[in-house]
A protein has these predicted regions:
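Metal-cofactor-dependent catalytic cores
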Residues: 1-267
Length: 267
């Protein structure tokens, strides 16, 4: 079994960035979901669930370490990383509230024009990251702006089984993974507790609960009329009302991940 694909999402709900290699640490892959768009009025986070145009945002790091934002019909914008303790803004992501630095008026204007709504862009420095949901992980674990956990793993074998049941292929990016592994039986990951990739050990914390987000085509931004893959997932991956696909992870320590690395099951 090996690591076959590696992705990060610099802006929450923005486009994926496929990687060949990446540093990984406390908050997951370097630069993953460290930026988030929030309502200007109340600091509430926005996602593609309600704001599909977020999916048009292509974000990357430029040579100077600034965030480069691109979207159809808009001039590219470079956004400096704000100081960790400056221009703090109260924001809400699900049940969590935190104070994080605002990225400034230029980024806010660029995003507000794209979305047709008054919004701000915020950044999560490591020292302002969130605790994980109650009951999961260690007290030392943290997450930036993912829904709850620093890393998400998808097993390619499970995706192929889902494709077989649906009758057509589903893009892996519908599930917003960070790590994709190849060479395991379908849903073998349900039984994993600890894995090793390269020299790093990862704890498998809980299955990922899926939602309507997965019905959005990552290329076109349109929802599938037949509600796939959720419709099929509900027939065999529903537990106590939750639809489960993929596993949430946390890493012990920090290091380097590269596509092709061997994946070992430790427990």
């Amino acid at each position: 079994m090996f690591l076959s694909e590696l992705y990060r999402y610099p802006v929450k709900s923005g486009q994926a960035q496929r990687l060949q290699a990446s540093p990984v640490g406390l908050l997951g892959l370097q630069g993953d979901r460290r930026w988030m768009v929030v309502e200007e009025e109340n600091g509430r986070f926005l996602t593609q669930r309600a704001w599909p145009r977020l999916g048009q945002i292509k974000a990357s790091d430029d040579d100077s370490g600034q965030l480069l934002l691109e979207a159809p019909g808009q001039a590219p914008l470079r956004v400096p990383v704000p100081p960790a303790d400056d221009a703090l803004r109260g924001v809400t992501i699900w049940r969590d509230t935190l104070r994080v630095p605002d990225a400034g008026d230029a980024a806010a204007a660029w995003l507000s024009q794209l979305l047709g709504k008054a919004v701000r862009l915020v950044h999560c420095p490591e020292q302002r990251a969130r605790y994980l949901p109650n009951g999961y992980g260690f007290n030392s674990d943290r997450a930036a702006f993912p829904d709850g956990f620093p890393l998400l793993l998808i097993n390619q074998g499970s995706l192929k089984e889902l494709d077989r049941r649906i009758g057509r292929p589903m893009e892996v990016l519908r599930f917003r993974p960070n790590l994709v592994v190849q060479g395991a039986e379908p849903f073998a990951e349900d039984g994993w507790k600890r894995i090793r990739i390269g020299s790093l050990e990862f704890r498998v914390l809980k299955p990922s609960v899926r939602c309507i987000f997965t019905t959005i085509d990552p290329v076109t931004g349109e929802r599938s009329e037949d509600r796939e893959p959720m419709a099929t997932l509900r027939t065999f991956r529903e537990k106590e009302g939750d639809v489960l696909f993929g596993q949430n992870l946390a890493v012990d320590g920090s290091g380097w991940l590269e596509v092709g690395m061997k994946v070992e099951i430790l427990e």
